[in-house]
């Protein structure tokens, strides 16, 4: 499917649940009300490239549209890209505005997804990404841009406790007045590398929070004054290294498991000191190296 505009579709494109392979969707744009692309039961590599969903195709006065009604309906109801079973999916240069959930990863009787997503974006959302279920090797997300501010408790990325696969984000931006940027309840691995985090909406909740599984946060920048990172009760292991912030990197720790904090920016002129970086953690739970050591786990 190529070079198509959808003006006012309720559901845009459905692939599956019948068995299928090697779809290619390229240079498709338009306004979708409930779902943009819904994908399931693809057992050989599919590709989605240069797809943009936006309310302006149908909200224009030239076609008798009403921006306010359409905008509200989409952020309250629309899911831009829904992925169930698909193997080795390639998603490149995609975007949606506005949206309830930009990219939703789910399980069906056919299974779940693994794949890579590069140059993806979601704006005016309640959730940019929600991960309910993925395959163990999971998701590789690179060069993402995520903005959430609509509805109750807007969060850019939410990884639910039903997730048992790896989620890895590299070189991505999070901004706009979201309550939080990333919240992970995942049982598996989460990696955040070379990302930009910000909000400015409130001062209580951490921009990044994890309370399950294992997380790595490396080489990231925290641009606003909220607590940067909350390592919550239930987290199995954390590596936090080489990060900086507008007024330092503020890390709160509520778990009895090990955390490794090294070479993080505390405040202007300060050297890294684990007792300053991590609040509320026993010193024997802090690793002095940047490598995961099983011996650091409590008995």
Question: What would you call each of these model-derived segments?
Answer:
Residues 1-299:
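Extracellular/periplasmic carbohydrate-active domains that bind, remodel
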């Amino acid at each position: 499917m190529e070079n198509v505009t959808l003006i006012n579709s309720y559901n845009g494109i459905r692939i599956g649940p019948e068995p299928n392979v090697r779809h290619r969707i390229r240079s498709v744009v338009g306004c979708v009300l409930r779902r943009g692309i819904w994908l399931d039961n693809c057992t050989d590599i599919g590709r989605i490239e240069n797809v943009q969903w936006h309310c302006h195709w149908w909200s224009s006065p030239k076609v008798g549209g009403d921006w306010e009604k359409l905008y509200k309906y989409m952020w309250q109801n629309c899911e831009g890209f829904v992925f169930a079973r698909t193997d080795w999916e390639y998603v490149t240069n995609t975007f949606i505005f506005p949206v309830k959930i930009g990219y939703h990863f789910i399980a069906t009787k056919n299974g779940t997804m693994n794949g890579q997503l590069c140059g993806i974006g979601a704006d005016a959302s309640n959730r940019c990404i929600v991960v309910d279920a993925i395959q163990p090797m999971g998701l590789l997300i690179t060069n993402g841009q995520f903005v959430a501010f609509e509805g109750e408790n807007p969060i850019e990325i939410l990884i639910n406790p039903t997730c048992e696969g790896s989620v890895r984000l590299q070189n991505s931006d999070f901004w706009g007045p979201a309550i939080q940027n990333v919240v992970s309840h995942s049982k598996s691995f989460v990696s955040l590398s070379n990302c930009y985090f910000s909000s400015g909406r409130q001062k209580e909740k951490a921009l990044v929070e994890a309370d399950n599984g294992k997380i790595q946060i490396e080489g990231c920048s925290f641009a606003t004054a909220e607590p940067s990172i909350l390592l919550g009760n239930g987290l199995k292991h954390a590596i936090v290294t080489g990060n900086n912030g507008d007024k330092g990197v503020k890390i709160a720790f509520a778990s009895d498991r090990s955390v490794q904090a090294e070479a993080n920016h505390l405040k202007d002129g300060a050297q890294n000191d684990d007792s300053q970086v991590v609040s509320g953690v026993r010193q024997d739970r802090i690793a002095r190296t940047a490598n995961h050591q099983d011996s650091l786990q409590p008995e």
